[in-house]
Amino acid sequence: MILASCIAVALLPLAASAQVDDAGILIDHVWSGHPVGFNLLTERGHQFIAYYDADRRLTLIGRKLGEAGSTRVQPEGVPVPKRKRTSNTLGWDSHNFLEMALDRDGYLHLSGNMHRDPLVYYRTRQPFDVSTLERVDRMTGELENEVTYPHFFKNERGDLMFRYRDGGSGKGSDYYNIYDERSREWTRLIEGSLLDGEGVRNAYSSGPVRSPDGNYHMVWMWRDTSDAATNHTLSYAYSRDLIHWQTSARKALELPITIKTGEVIDDARPGEGLINMAFNIGFDAESHPIVSYHRYDAEGHSQAYVARPDSRGNWLIRSLSDWDFRWGFSGGGSINGEVRLGSPVLTDEGAMMLNYSTKAAGGGRWYFDSDTLVLLPPPSREPEASESKVALNYAGSNYPGMQSKSVSSTSEEGRWVLRWETLGKNRDHPREVIPPPAELRLYKIF
C-alpha cells in the first residue's frame, strides 16, 4: 500500500458559534459548469466539507464546532491517462460525486471522482485532522480499476463498510468491503459480488437501507446497456447482517444475486419506464418495506408507483399519480431528472407520505394508507420543509440556467445544509462556455 501526503494546507477563518445568521457561512467559490455531488459530514463535534473548488480541484475543509477557524486541504492525485487529468481534478462527469465517513476511532475516509476509473481513496493519519489526509492506493487491491458509485456506511455493529460497482452500465457487479480499525485494512465482506450482472448487465440499487427493526433492505433494477431506456426488472432482498440475504417471504438467496435469483417487485421490461434516478425505499409502522418508483402506464404516460409485499412474497402495486405526460429518456451519460420521488415516510398520524417533483406538473406530496396503498386526504396541517428558510436566503446568480443544489447533515449538534449553484447535467460532455464560479454556503437549521 502506497501512502502519499496531502498538499495545500491552509487555516481559514470560520464562524466560531454554532449559531449562524440567515446568510450562512461563505465557504468558498466552486465549480458550476455541471452538477456533481459534494459532501457534508457532521459528527462527534467535528464538521467536514468535501467539494470541487472553482478550478475543479478536490478540496476538503475540516473544523471543530464551537471553535473559530478551519483547515482546508487539497489532496494530491495521480495521472488518469484515459481522462487526460489527475485523480484529484474533476472533468465533466456528473457521476463523480464525493463520499466521506468517520470510522470508530475518528479517522476520516474520503472517496470519489470516479466513473469506471481506478480507485480514488484518502484517509487521515490522525483522528478528525484533515491536515493529515493521505492518498491510499488500494483497499483490497482486487477489482479496483473500474470503480463507480462509492458509498460508505455502517453495519449494525458500527463497522465501516464500502460499497462500489466494478465495471460499467450493462456490464458490472456490486462489491462490499469492511474496515478493521486495528489493522487499518479493508477486506471483502462476502466472497465475490453481492449483485452480479454476469458480464451482460448491471444493477442499480437503492440501499442497503436499515429499517427501524434493524434489517437491511435493498431494491434494485437491472440495466442491459449504457442506454437508460434498458432498465428493467425491479427487484428486492433483505438481510439482518448484510451477509445472508433473503426474499420478503424469507427464502434464502444464494450469492451472488443475479437476475434469475432475485425477488421481482415489478417485471417491467426495457423501454417501460424504470429509471435509476427515481426509486426509493421506506418503511411502515411495522418496518415493512414500501418502495416508490417511476414507470410508464398502459397509455405510455409517466406515473409514480408504490409497492409493498405480503407475507407470501406477493407485491401489491398501486399508482399514486394520474399524470398525462411522458418523461422520455434514452441514451448514455448523465441526464436531467424530470421526475423525482422521495422515500415513503411514516407520519405521526400513521399514514405514509411521499414527496415528489416533476418538470411537467410541478411537485407536492401524497398521503396513502400503508396497507392498501390507497390515497388519503392530506392532514389539516402539513409539515414545512426544514430548508425553506435557507432557500429564501440564498442569493443566487443571474447566470442563465443555474440550478440550486444542496446537501444536508444531521447529528447531535444539529442540522446543517450546504448550498451552491450549478448548470444542469450535459450528458457528461464539455460545455463551450464555462460559467463563473458559484458561492458555496453553509447554513445551520434552527
Each predicted region: which residue ranges?
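Bacterial N-terminal signal peptides
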Residues: 4-13
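Sec/Tat signal peptide C-region and signal peptidase I cleavage site
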Residues: 14-18
